[in-house]
Curated annotation (Swiss-Prot):
Disulfide bonds: none
Species whose genome carries this gene: Variovorax paradoxus (strain S110)
UniProt KW keywords: Cytoplasm, Hydrolase, Metal-binding, Nickel
Gene: ureC
Stated name of the protein: Urease subunit alpha
Residues at which Ni(2+) 1 binds: H139, H141, K222, D365
Amino acid sequence: MATIGRRAYAEIFGPTVGDRVRLADTDLLIEVEADYTLRAGGYGEEVKFGGGKTIRDGMAQSQRTRAQGAVDTVLTNALILDHWGIVKADIGLKDGRIAAIGKAGNPDVQPGVDIVIGPGTEIISCEGNIVTAGGIDSHIHFICPQQIEEALASGITTMLGGGTGPATGTFATTATPGPWHIERMLQAADAFPMNLGFLGKGNASLPDALHEQIEAGVMGLKLHEDWGTTPSAISNCLDVADATDTQVAIHSDTLNESGFVENTIAAVGGRSICAFHTEGAGGGHAPDILRVVGEENFLPSSTNPTMPYTVNTLDEHVDMLMVCHHLDAGIAEDLAFAESRIRKETIAAEDVLHDLGAISMFSSDSQAMGRVGEVVLRCWQTAHKMKLQRGKLPEDSERNDNFRVKRYVAKYTINPAISHGIAHEVGSIEVGKWADLVIWKPAFFGVKPFTLIKGGTIAMAAMGDPNASIPTPQPVHYRPMFGSYGGSLARSSLTFVSQAGLAAGIKERYGLAKHLSAVKNIRNVRKKDLVHNGYTPKMEIDAQTYAVRADGHLLTCDPAVQLPLTQRYFLF
């Protein structure tokens, strides 16, 4: 039987079992765990499109119609990187969803085919490329709509948060307050090739105004200290969430005016709640908000300006905070408020807590102490930094960093999906889910995607000069594709709403074009449900020195002096 060398095979069909791939210029190596394209019984039945290749009539392309089982699109020979595995496979898409993950081809002439290619099937060649689920950014200040294009170009396909534009309240808080603003933001969502979901204002001591917002269509509620996150507001907001199966996100009381972290934990009362920027630089009980990392009902996340900890982190934060929270540097109390939130000890511990799987999610805090286009990038920078500083994780072999990579990819994909009740639609590459996929060339992994697929349609891509004779000539930059225009846009993206809002008929009442998907199964979520990131240590934070201990171990790390995924990727 004819054979081919491993290097030649990888160059033609992409890596297979046992091959390793470096992620961009990081020190992270992944190894292919399984190859689903071998379901034909071994090598030799791979599919590939092009002149002289196998996806041709009567070969790997069958005569079957769509009604007879042919899929709409196949991503061939993709290296899937997801929380559940790192595998080589063909991916079949149909009706905007992932229809199958396995072996594509023509079942009339090939064995082991579970994805049928027909005359009506489009091909996206992924040989040598990595495919991840679209990222989810769960901490968005909707300050300007241009954030959405920036986020999409970085690999984010779902944005959750609140706001009404460049209003003072939105500069500081992720809340879309009241039915009128909620209706307007849901109508605006129809214009963007992005899954969107909005949080209402949760700061109230009586329930009626919160129920009103849930019924208007918000997918959850936000408690923010700038609106007064008191124990009574916390308890009332969670009562409404329990009654409506929605999530609550909390930014607690930095100044400890209405109580300390113990009082907030008591007011939450064991109920599920998302804790944003859990380290505290972004806000929360000073200096010990990190205590909540040890609570099983708190679902902790970080925002990206403190991640990873570098020699520049502390210097930029005070000025950034003053602007975001409408503070005046000429007022001593305002300056003290800002400085109380910036602590190098807790920022250093944050990196380590991520590596331990104790902080479960990444997000941006867009334009409000965070960078909307750097969620994915900073996540992988942190993984790289922790490998250099802490070494291999015990779950990883000497050959690869597969477990660490799965832990970190889960932080911006499946875990925010689970936490916010949207995991039935997005957050992973699994059959039945919305086909939001990001294709990366390995050399650019985590920093610059190659192609972005929304609901089965290409919505954005790194595209060359439109007047060139081929697609590749410079300048290559991110350009919207057909999935970002016209009726295709509305059919390729979702808007997440409450069950109550969907039942109230807001789609028709507001005249919405996008498909509305109701959040669900939220109120029983616990930290142990968050994939690869469910560690709940006993947390201790020294009120004088700010030293952080988890299960008795001091957590600290040095600031990075240099990082991957930086200047060499941004020369132009």
